[in-house]
């Protein structure tokens, strides 16, 4: 019996995957929509999720008796309810397992830095102003980043890239991360309370888990 693989994600990824599989399994590109995914998983052997648009709940997994593996094109897997998968012994693979590959993948860090710049220079409000015909630049002075203090919560791969970007802009970089042993170059370790009290810009780069849920909460902003 030919194994059946369900793929969720962009057409380009499906095409590339089809070339790799080369007919050794039946590969199906399924719309990232809950009902379609649940129906497709019924007799699937594997789920390759490159969309992360659908929450894969216990019910979907329980209704897929032939499912043997789930693989995600992300470093996190909080879009999957692990309960039934763990009960069945179904492994969930993510990109976190391939550190060498991840080391030079920078889009998440680049987008994060773009958001820092957009917030510091008040770009959304300024853009809306100009689209309405305005050109009152003094209304949007923004924040000069040079000489300011950047605080990173989570100092792993993405945090390390953020530190480089901050240093390139002339910022002092401090970080909080109780889970790492080796700190990226240029980050000064500090406590979470101290980070909030001293930093002009704060950027969060941690996976959502039971340990990290609520890590950044209202009292820190008071």
Regions flagged by a language model, labelled:
Residues 1-51, 170-174:
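N-terminal glycine-/charge-rich "phosphate-binding" loop or analogous flexible N-terminal tail
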Residues 8, 50, 73, 205-208:
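Short, well-ordered coil/turn residues at beta-beta hairpins
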Residues 40-46, 64-68, 198-202:
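Short acidic/histidine-rich motifs immediately flanking catalytic phosphotransfer sites
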Residues 46-127:
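Phosphate/diphosphate ligand-binding glycine-rich loop within oxidoreductases
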Residues 54-57, 174, 178-222:
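Rossmann-like adenosine-cofactor binding region
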Residues 99, 126-161:
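Glycine-rich NAD(P)-binding loop of Rossmann-like domains
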Residues 166:
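Aromatic pocket-lining residues of Rossmann-like dinucleotide-binding sites
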